[in-house]
From Swiss-Prot:
The modification N-acetylalanine is found at A2. One of its GO terms (biological process) is spermatogenesis. One of its GO terms (cellular component) is eukaryotic translation initiation factor 2 complex. Disruption phenotype: Knockout males are infertile. Their testes are smaller as compared to wild-type fertile males and exhibit spermatogonial proliferation block. This is Eukaryotic translation initiation factor 2 subunit 3, Y-linked. Residues 48-55 are annotated as: G1. Belongs to the TRAFAC class translation factor GTPase superfamily. Classic translation factor GTPase family. EIF2G subfamily. Residues 39-247 form the tr-type G domain. Widely expressed. In the adult brain, high levels in hippocampus, habenula, hypothalamic nuclei and cerebellum. Also expressed in embryonic brain. Residues 225-227 are annotated as: G5. Keywords: Acetylation, GTP-binding, Hydrolase, Initiation factor, Nucleotide-binding, Phosphoprotein, Protein biosynthesis.
Amino acid sequence: MAGGEAGVTLGQPHLSRQDLATLDVTKLTPLSREIISRQATINIGTIGHVAHGKSTVVKAISGVHTVRFKNELERNITIKLGYANAKIYKLDDSSCPRPECYRSCGSSTPDEFPSDIPGTKGNFRLVRHVSFVDCPGHDILMATMLNGAAVMDAALLLIAGNESCPQPQTSEHLAAIEIMKLKHILILQNKIDLVKESQAKEQYEQILAFVQGTVAEGAPIIPISAQLKYNIEVVCEYIVKKIPVPLRDFTSEPRLIVIRSFDVNKPGCEVDDLKGGVAGGSILKGVLKVGQEIEVRPGIVSKDGEGKLMCKPIFSKIVSLFAEHNDLQYAAPGGLIGVGTKIDPTLCRADRMVGQVLGAVGALPEIFTELEISYFLLRRLLGVRTEGDKKAAKVQKLSKNEVLMVNIGSLSTGGRVSAVKADLGKIVLTNPVCTEVGEKIALSRRVEKHWRLIGWGQIRRGVTIKPTIDDE
């Protein structure tokens, strides 16, 4: 590989090569070796109550610590969505018993490596590449959790073995998974090293009772200790056997939901060395390629002289693609992908682009300023501890002119209810959003100073605005 041809991955020779010249998207699958060698194709959320060990489990499986920000480390909680990728391997020697034949490693590990288990031979071969979306467990951070749920294919529900089940956020998260129609759930009974066997069995019964009648009914319950890495290979085995590989669309025009964005330039950087903004997100469909022209909607939002909203989509070009530390020439749905662009870095600074949609020019959905939704409210507030035998507070009906928080894809924005009739509602959004009819949205209301999930809806139609495009 001398001289480096365009369109071929140069870095990481131990991973499968990606070559744009020979790329045929119709032949790709979520298990194609050249894809899973470099990026994850399944998104798994970790959900559960605060301090039940979600981030620790992700660290045990992937080796990546998802708590990255200073204020998160000090308080030992996850605030922003954390991400980590892990490769799961299976030993090709059939004499090795389960679950020892499964193993997880970080995302830049080679695609196969020889067995180090005494008495076995053969190689560990890559079978899955998963991305963990580590969601915050605090009720105040519920919006972040819902933004994560938009990109999940499956979920690990964590329950700490040394506390009674269910804890408040556990039920709220379970409701969020129901909204997002996540069918594949593994329940992990964590911190098993801290309790006696009888206690663990008793809690097992509590968990069974708690999930009865929910989407998690019948989900496997695996006792683990994330801190001691006990039973982690069983979790790997279940991820491979119980979570089906989602069907992906590789042939449509690509579309990515932006979940975070950054300016990667250091202060004092020379002008010639400035790099464009980086958007991180999950591709919903299609394949993004290096060198491709892209559009970001709604783009730059402003008001004209008469106070009318204007949206100016951002047009740019992809200069690099990466998944954690792996370079990509093309990126497929699943996993968190970093997209290096030529966009002005100040527009991407500190997550400013979150909630925008990035994709092929001219192929993105409409920009809505008002939505008409058919909605469904929860009967009672979730996750609020109540005194004694009193049931949780009832959810009041939507009232005209009240302000709700609306979650659409990865965007959280305010919305004023302008009309309500039976199960239909009209909402005027504070920020315009790029979305389509049929998308699901989550509704939260401010209750005692916290945003609480009160229900969800589906977009039936809405008021759209035409994007303003400069005639250059």
